[in-house]
Amino acid sequence: VLYLNQALRKGWRFSSYRSESGAEVDLVIETDRDLIGIEVKAGRNVSPADTRGLVSLGELVGRKRRFKKWIIYRGEWKQRFDNGVEAWPVIEALKALR
């Protein structure tokens, strides 16, 4: 992701998130149009429990700006949870960020 930002001269800003209750998001990308919360999972499976930090950050952001909630994982299928979080295979996520 850092390489994409540099190579494509995107000008993205990076941070992370942790709430007082311990909910975390590994990477937050701020683009000109969007805020993208990314939780990175090493496994091949994801579950609704993996969405906790993204949902917490989404509640904080509210409707102030468009917020995409992504989990990037080593699985093969793109998934969408009922709470709006999307799970992306690594390669598909990198292509989508371009």
Spell out what each predicted region is.
Residues 1-98:
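A cross-kingdom feature that marks ATP-driven nucleic-acid transaction machinery
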